[in-house]
């Protein structure tokens, strides 16, 4: 199919009637005559914003004017602008073609750091516009073909082929929908391409998901390389299924298994299905309802053996000789708490054969140095001597996968290689023979998007946006002052004023830098108690917003604003959050986040504060809620908040829920 990737030309004479303008427009017209779109601009404008076009452009043509050059090219405004623009583009995109277009200047007039990033140097009036256009288009086409990962490229080729389909699915490339009025709506909503690409495993050129061959197998191997794994298996029905695959491959009835008690339901289902006998590692929890990490001491081999001895279901087992088959850890928690996986590997290597990190919420961490060793598999890390490492990741949660896109990553140990045939038996057990190819394509594309430098830039943008949001929230709080109220964002007290924060600020510890409790016994910001040095950190892209009314010790204030009312208010005003607690709600800064989105959230929180302070009637500020719950329509917003807050305080719900959990 024809994609819209214009060739971007930046020339201050693009719209002028002088010879330079006539020359560059002649090239643009020749490019358009070949079927490519041209986007012309006369200035670089905001360099960083214009460079965002790198994701939409098939090539850049940057004009340099002779009169702009003066002695000392490193200081010339033309060179400075050129260098800045190229750096911005290359920060995200190492491959998009960049051409320089000029009258008499040659490569000897430009510094080498600029030259090495160029695909060509075009001289005005030397070659015909048609030849120049063909030369640029050749590289543009090569670039667009080169960025297509294996399976997505094969799927595009198949959809373009126009073959008649005599296999399932029954809608036959969407044709069946065209025979019904409601089907017409469905077809128009999803579009031709999605339906033409919805095929079955009879299409040999696409490969077989269940056999991991052909284009699909090539894509899985490519993803394994990008994610620092030895093996990758795409999963089309979510990480719930990925977890079950790992367990059915590694665990047999009666096996002892070590499990994070803060595990996903799929792990509990895996325990039931495999007939394993679990011992649980107990996490912490603060009174905001935020589940914290498991203490490092619980990962000690002797601590695990003590749990085995204490388990009545394992009374027949010799705790000193039995080896648990698998350890499964939620990495990260829903709220963003991470573990130093290298420390865990060192502690358990050889004692537990299979180390499984459920990284449903952490597929992005491998692509930015901010996360250090706080994710399962990283570049240039020593692999365990005996234990095989598994990571199950939800590509759809924080990367650019569509819903249910997941993958299993496996890293061999030094002396144990994954038995792929045996693993595939578990894979077959949990996979459909009719997988959704759009999900496979999104796994393939999501992996390609994370290839550095693009992936690193995407994650860095997420981190920067989350930090800027936190800074903006603190600024609002400071301006309101101590006599007024505002929402807080849970996280470290120290925050750098600009840029990427120091990762050490996000490591969970007591106030003391050595991880030692302060002499006054005061907890640090997380309230999870003593933390082993360097063992846990908070992912900054996971933001928990705290509403007034409850402190970190579980004590209720005289007034309060339950989070459930805030999030219902936000939903009515076009802001939908990830989850809601008693006095907190949770948002994520994924790679799809924008400044407009988080600034809109902040302004809606301002609007809530105004309505709360004025005690606006519910029928006015939350009409949809009142339509379903007319009992509250005559109440004021502040009155309703106080009513629910009083009930929470009366029954001490924060302490009660913590006690129930622990």
PLM regions with names:
Residues 182-279:
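Long, structured ligand/cofactor-binding scaffold of large enzymes
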Residues 26-37, 226-227, 275-277:
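Short helix-loop-beta junction
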Residues 13-22, 64-77, 104-107, 333-337:
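Short acidic, S/G/P-rich loop/turn micro-motifs used as interaction or catalytic elements
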Residues 56-59, 118-123, 130, 230, ...:
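Conserved acidic residues
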Residues 3-31, 40, 60, 271:
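Conserved acidic segment of CheY-like receiver
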Residues 41-44, 49-53, 74, 87, ...:
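Conserved PLP-enzyme active-site core in the AAT-like
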Residues 13-15, 100-108, 127-128, 360-369:
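Short beta-alpha junction loops
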Residues 5, 29-32, 46, 51-60, ...:
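Non-catalytic terminal extensions of PLP-dependent enzymes
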């Amino acid at each position: 199919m024809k994609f819209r990737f214009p060739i971007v030309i930046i020339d201050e004479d693009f719209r002028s009637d002088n010879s330079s303008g006539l020359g560059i427009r002649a090239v643009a017209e020749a490019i358009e005559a070949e079927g490519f779109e041209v986007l012309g601009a006369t200035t670089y404008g905001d360099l960083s914003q214009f460079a965002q076009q790198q994701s939409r452009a098939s090539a850049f043509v940057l004009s340099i004017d002779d009169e702009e050059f003066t002695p000392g090219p490193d200081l010339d405004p033309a060179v400075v602008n050129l260098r800045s623009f190229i750096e911005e583009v290359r920060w995200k995109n190492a491959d998009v073609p960049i051409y320089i277009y000029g009258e008499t200047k040659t490569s000897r007039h430009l510094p080498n750091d600029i030259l090495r990033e160029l695909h060509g140097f075009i001289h005005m009036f030397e070659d015909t516009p048609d030849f120049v256009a063909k030369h640029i288009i050749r590289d543009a086409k090569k670039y667009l073909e080169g960025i297509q990962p294996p399976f997505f490229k094969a799927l595009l080729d198949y959809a373009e082929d126009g073959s008649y389909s005599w296999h399932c699915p029954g809608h036959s490339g969407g044709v069946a929908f065209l025979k019904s009025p409601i089907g017409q709506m469905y077809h128009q909503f999803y579009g031709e391409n999605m339906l033409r690409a919805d095929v079955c495993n009879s299409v040999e050129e696409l490969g077989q998901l269940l056999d991991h061959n052909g284009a699909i197998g090539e894509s899985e191997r490519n993803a394994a390389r990008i994610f620092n794994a030895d093996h990758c298996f795409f999963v089309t029905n979510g990480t719930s299924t990925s977890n079950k695959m790992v367990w059915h491959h590694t665990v047999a009835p009666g096996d002892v298994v070590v499990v994070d008690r803060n595990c996903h339901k799929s792990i509990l289902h895996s325990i039931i299905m495999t007939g394993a006998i679990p011992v649980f590692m107990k996490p912490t929890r603060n009174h905001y309802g935020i589940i914290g990490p498991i203490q490092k001491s619980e990962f000690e081999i002797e601590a695990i053996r003590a749990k085995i001895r204490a388990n009545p279901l394992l009374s027949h087992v010799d705790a000193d000789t039995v080896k648990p088959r698998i350890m499964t850890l939620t990495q990260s928690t829903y709220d963003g708490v991470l573990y130093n996986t290298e420390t865990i590997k060192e502690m358990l290597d050889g004692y537990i054969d299979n180390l499984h990190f459920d990284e449903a919420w952490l597929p992005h961490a491998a692509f930015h140095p901010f996360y250090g060793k706080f994710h399962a598999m990283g570049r240039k890390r020593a692999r365990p001597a005996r234990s095989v490492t598994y990571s199950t990741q939800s590509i759809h949660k924080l990367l650019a996968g569509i819903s249910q896109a997941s993958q299993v990553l496996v890293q061999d140990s030094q002396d144990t290689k994954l038995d792929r045939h045996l693993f595939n038996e578990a894979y077959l057990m949990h996979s459909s023979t009719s997988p959704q190819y759009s999900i496979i394509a999104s796994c393939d594309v999501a992996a390609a998007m994370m290839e550095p430098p693009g992936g690193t830039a995407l994650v860095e943008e997420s981190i920067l946006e989350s930090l800027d949001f936190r800074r903006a929230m603190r600024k609002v709080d400071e301006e309101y002052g101590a006599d007024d109220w505002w929402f807080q964002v849970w996280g470290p007290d120290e925050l750098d004023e600009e840029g990427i924060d120091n990762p050490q600020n996000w490591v969970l510890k007591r106030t003391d830098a050595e991880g030692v409790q302060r002499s006054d016994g005061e907890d640090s910001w997380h309230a999870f108690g003593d933390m082993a040095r360097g063992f846990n950190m908070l992912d900054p892209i996971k933001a928990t917003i705290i509403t007034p009314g409850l402190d970190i010790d579980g004590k209720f204030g005289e007034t309060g604003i339950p989070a459930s009312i805030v999030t219902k208010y936000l939903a009515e005003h076009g802001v939908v959050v990830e989850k809601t607690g008693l006095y907190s709600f949770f948002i994520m800064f994924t790679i799809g986040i924008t400044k407009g989105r988080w600034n809109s959230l902040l302004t809606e929180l301002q609007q809530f504060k105004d309505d709360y302070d004025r005690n606006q009637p519910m029928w006015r500020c939350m009409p949809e809620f009142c339509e379903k719950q007319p009992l509250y329509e005559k109440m004021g917003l502040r009155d309703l908040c106080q009513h629910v807050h009083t009930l929470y305080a009366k029954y001490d719900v924060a302490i009660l829920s913590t006690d129930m959990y622990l």
